[in-house]
């Protein structure tokens, strides 16, 4: 498998700047970061834990008399 060096990374960054423009870079970076974060959560199973916790928190409270 070919290794990615600093020159290849620079070329990729330049291509991203040309394609998306400087104004869109923060939005693109944010979207990529969220995607990576969601992928990591899904691969470690944190989503399932959060769903269980959310369901427990949303149970209706018992009425007091």
From Swiss-Prot:
Domain of life here? Bacteria
The answer on whether this UniProt entry bears the keyword Membrane reads yes
Q: How does this chain sit within the bilayer? A: Single-pass membrane protein
Annotated Pfam families? TatA_B_E (PF02416)
Q: Where is the composition biased (Basic and acidic residues)?
A: 43-65
Q: Which GO terms describe its cellular component?
A: TAT protein transport complex
Instruction: Report TM segments.
Output: 9-29
- Region (Disordered), start-end ranges: 40-65
Q: Name one GO biological process term.
A: protein transport by the Tat complex
Instruction: State the UniProt keywords alphabetically.
Output: Cell membrane, Membrane, Protein transport, Translocation, Transmembrane, Transmembrane helix, Transport
Q: Which family does it belong to?
A: Belongs to the TatA/E family.
Tell me, in a sentence or two, what this protein's role is: Part of the twin-arginine translocation (Tat) system that transports large folded proteins containing a characteristic twin-arginine motif in their signal peptide across membranes. TatA could form the protein-conducting channel of the Tat system.
Identification of the protein by name: Sec-independent protein translocase protein TatA
